[in-house]
Amino acid sequence: VLIFQHDSGLLKDGIEEFLEWDFIGSWIKNIPGCMNGGLSIRNPKLMYEICSKHRYKGMAVHGNEDIYFTNKMRELGYKLPDKATCNKFAVETEFEYGSVGYHAIDKYHKNYNLLLNQYD
């Protein structure tokens, strides 16, 4: 399933290249190994499995669902991408040209319109 929040955007074709992953989203710079879910692709069967078998008890520092899912999925050995692959899919805190999409870049990049104009 594709999660596409209001502050997300697609910049070019290619989203189908990332369907192999159980979860992929933009890399979260200050939380190693975690991905943001604002623009993400998730395996719904695995999301359901995690919710039904692993009760959510909150996280010590970050309690958002994307942090919970990516931490739990890494712990359980699901198929998750590395940072370079995440950046090819979507960017957020660290902008890299060539990404298929973005999430919430206006929060982290003052001149985000200039970055997006590079795709026109």
Where are these regions (language model features)?
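Catalytic core and acceptor-binding pocket of nucleotide-sugar-dependent glycosyltransferases
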Residues: 34-120
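Active-site acidic Asp-centered loop
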Residues: 4-5
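Short aromatic/hydrophobic "clamp" motif used to bind/position activated sugar donors
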Residues: 1
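Conserved donor-nucleotide/metal-binding helix-loop-beta segment in metal-dependent transferases, i.e.
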Residues: 8-34
